[in-house]
Amino acid sequence: MEMEIKALLVDDEEQCVKTLQDGIDWKVLGVAETFGAYNAVQAREIMKEEMISLILCDIEMPGESGLEFISSVREKADLNDENIECIILTCYPDYKFMRKAMQIGCSDYLIKPIDTDEMTAVLEKAVEKIQKKFQKDEKEKKLFPDAMKTSFSEGQQNIIDGKVIPYIQEHFSETLTVTEIA
């Protein structure tokens, strides 16, 4: 099974998003598709529909900052650093922003304007981490194929596979309760 990496580019400057989408050979890097958003609200909408593996995000945006957005995505989805690679793109070489970015699990912090070679190197590293995590997950699935299914009857597993998992995927970026899922 092959991993399809999807990247989400979040910046209130439309030209920045367009430049990133058009100026980088994403396919060569191993990224299948990119999505652009101009604020945190749009970014969340995209994340409801797509399984994003890589986020490149500006800090200063109208409404919610990029740091707040990434922090909330991680909290709501209970994600750790290995699930989604996050990279900050900003004009602010401010230590407190850098520190916060590292605290919320961002893998890098790039200052605009960004050197193409530096950007490519950072993206290659992020894609490699995503691929390694996916390969590790696939190996675990092969080693323990029935680990999750052994405690459920066939009927229960069918409900989980047919209703519960699609519901969770559809509401991935929202806070969910056991009652809502049930």
Regions found by a protein language model. Name each.
Residues R44-I46, E50-D161:
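CheY-like receiver
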Residues V164-L176:
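Basic, amphipathic alpha-helical hairpins
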Residues I181-A182:
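Short alpha-helical "recognition helix" segments of helix-turn-helix
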Residues V28-Y38, I46, M98:
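Short hydrophobic/Thr-rich beta-strand motif most characteristic of the beta2 strand and flanking loop
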